[in-house]
Amino acid sequence: MREVISIHVGQAGIQVGNACWELFCLEHGIQPDGQMPSNKTIGGGDDAFNTFFSETGTGKHVPRCVFLDLGPTVIDEVRTGTYRQLFHPEQLISGKEDAANNFARGHYTIGKEIVDLCLDGIRKLADQCTGLQGFLVFNSVGGGTGSGLGSLLLERLSVDYGKKSKLGFTIYPSPQVSTAVVEPYNSVLSTHSLLEHTDVAVMLDNEAVYDICRRNLDIERPTYTNLNRLIAQVISSLTASLRFDGALNVDVTEFQTNLVPYPRIHFMLSSAPVISAEKAYHEQLSVAEITNSAFEPASMMAKCDPRHGKYMACCLMYRGDVVPKDVNAAVATIKTKRTIQFVDWCPTGFKCGINYQPPTVVPSGDLAKVMRAVCMISNSTAIAEVFSRIDHKFDLMYAKRAFVHWYVGEGMEEGEFSEAREDLAALEKDYEEVGIETAEGEGEEEGME
């Protein structure tokens, strides 16, 4: 088997995790207590879902995941929630006091005490796997636990499981909506280690997902549950090819190979065109239509405009009633569009996956039941907008050394701030250079080598 272990760190990671496992269980016909009634087996005896679930002797299916948090409150909700019987108690690891939005507490003082417990939990899961392909890490970089403990854990995973790929689903601070004053600090400090210790990071941001909920799903006042369910749909589409059999299946390492041209350029934009139940009642969208809308700025899950940048590569994951012929036609149309620009050194740029399992919807959820859907992750130079926004906010605060004493008091050194900030400045520069036309600069290149 090619198993994948999911790691949910901090409040955002855990709540997105809840939405994901709720959806995965529905997709595979697994009940909240982990039982899978034999008559409900979708796809007739397809066991590909074992990449995400392990089966116990009593026929119970347990998610291959751990939930980690420094404070007890969020994990207690899982312990008492609908899916409490799904998880083994050892998979839910929580501490006594939280990181208080402080990267240094999550990474140094408090995180250090709990990280070995976490790694033991992960080791137990890894030992049950026959061919572990890698890890999915869910966290946000604005808070203290997701950023601090999240990056500490990634660093330790690199040491313990060097060759295994690590995919991050990372919630970045939004341009307008903020949940903490020190978000820019936490984000810059933790992106510093995301650069080093993840192979692919998919960027999500709440504001962009809010807008999708409001605009496409007509939800006037979206809650976090609405947001997380939408994010779960994207993650489900990306991982569907690991959990179901399909025509063009995509492995975790395949994402890496096709999307990452240079090791540092691995921050992805994701997009998922969704429509509300009311709209779907009147129209079924064709493959060409959903493909076009995947490239619309309005479908992007992070606040940045892909028209301001160039695409290096993109991965289109279709599910449901889709055949390769339609996909090829849709992609050919995209290539002729002037608004969608690719860098000139990457002429093909498309990787497609097709999965015959149509999207499942959560009962009483907001999404329509549709025949076919697409989800795209793309590597675009436009993502640099996200970094420059955070860097700018970081600079404003750091110029006055505002709030820095909280970090230094937890054992950080001021030098780490400037080191992380310089690393991000270099990253912005990298993105700029990748997007520059190569044809013009050929003469200069030789001088530089």
UniProtKB/Swiss-Prot annotation:
One of its GO terms (molecular function) is hydrolase activity. GTP binds at residues 11, 140, 144-145, 179, 206, 228. Keywords: Acetylation, Cytoplasm, Cytoskeleton, GTP-binding, Hydrolase, Microtubule, Nucleotide-binding. Transmembrane segments: none annotated. Acetylation of alpha chains at Lys-40 stabilizes microtubules and affects affinity and processivity of microtubule motors. This modification has a role in multiple cellular functions, ranging from cell motility, cell cycle progression or cell differentiation to intracellular trafficking and signaling. Its EC number is 3.6.5.-. It is found in: Cytoplasm, Cytoskeleton. Its main location: cytoplasm. One of its GO terms (cellular component) is microtubule. It catalyses: GTP + H2O = GDP + phosphate + H(+). Pfam families: Tubulin, Tubulin_C. The modification N6-acetyllysine is found at residue 40. The active site is at 254. SUPFAM superfamilies: Tubulin C-terminal domain-like (SSF55307), Tubulin nucleotide-binding domain-like (SSF52490). GO terms for biological process: microtubule-based process. Gene3D superfamilies: Helix hairpin bin, Tubulin/FtsZ, C-terminal domain, Tubulin/FtsZ, GTPase domain. Tubulin is the major constituent of microtubules, a cylinder consisting of laterally associated linear protofilaments composed of alpha- and beta-tubulin heterodimers. Microtubules grow by the addition of GTP-tubulin dimers to the microtubule end, where a stabilizing cap forms. Below the cap, tubulin dimers are in GDP-bound state, owing to GTPase activity of alpha-tubulin. Belongs to the tubulin family. Dimer of alpha and beta chains. A typical microtubule is a hollow water-filled tube with an outer diameter of 25 nm and an inner diameter of 15 nM. Alpha-beta heterodimers associate head-to-tail to form protofilaments running lengthwise along the microtubule wall with the beta-tubulin subunit facing the microtubule plus end conferring a structural polarity. Microtubules usually have 13 protofilaments but different protofilament numbers can be found in some organisms and specialized cells. This is Tubulin alpha-2 chain. It comes from Stylonychia lemnae (Ciliate).
